[in-house]
Curated annotation (Swiss-Prot):
It holds the Pfam family LMBR1. One of its GO terms (cellular component) is plasma membrane. This is CASP-like protein SELMODRAFT_416721. Homodimer and heterodimers. It is a multi-pass membrane protein. The chain crosses the membrane at residues 93-113, 135-155. Residues 114-134 are extracellular. Keywords: Cell membrane, Membrane, Transmembrane, Transmembrane helix. The lineage of its organism: Eukaryota, Viridiplantae, Streptophyta, Embryophyta, Tracheophyta.
Length: 166
């Protein structure tokens, strides 16, 4: 349950801080083009079977291209693109912090309500009941958010590589 909020907070931490200059963009794009040519060269394909190593290098190359495009938005609405990048980075931080809170609340509820016999405190059950008494669908909506977060955490944990070193 920790991979989703940690990934979101790290995505905020590793975001592009400012738009890079055109000279930096050209240099980085040239380096990426060289790496791309090395990956697709006929001699390399003959030396190696196009297996796991080449596919992994291709994935890393695609990640680097995406990071470069985020750091240097292009087109007619480059300013808008940069603003959207900044807003998405801030949203990742906010959802990461909220996700961290949900990741702490779920196990705490399991310990307080499920593992202790008799239950020490109704905790989330009481919260959902109180929200339902405030407005009919508020408790149901809060429960749906908790369940959706749990599913997204499981999917994030499944997709997250165990040893993400390049």
């Amino acid at each position: 349950m920790a991979t989703l909020p940690v990934s979101l907070v790290f995505a905020f931490k590793n975001r592009p801080k400012c738009v890079i200059t055109r000279a930096q963009y050209v240099k980085e794009a040239t380096d990426l083009a060289k790496r791309s040519n090395e990956l697709g060269s006929p001699t390399r394909r003959k030396d190696e079977s196009f297996g796991k190593i080449s596919i992994q290098e291709l994935v890393f190359l695609e990640d680097d291209v995406q990071a470069l495009n985020e750091a240097f938005p292009q087109g007619e609405k480059a300013d808008t693109s940069w603003a959207v990048t900044v807003l998405f980075s801030l949203a990742k931080l906010v959802f990461g912090i909220l996700g961290l809170a949900l990741s702490v609340i779920w196990p705490l509820h399991i310990i307080v309500f499920m593992l202790v016999n008799p239950p020490a405190f109704p905790f989330l059950n009481q919260v959902f009941i109180q929200l339902d008494s405030a407005w009919g669908l508020l408790g149901t909506t809060a429960f749906a958010i908790f369940c959706y977060y749990l599913v997204m955490s499981v999917i994030s944990g499944e997709m997250h590589s165990i040893h993400p070193m390049k």
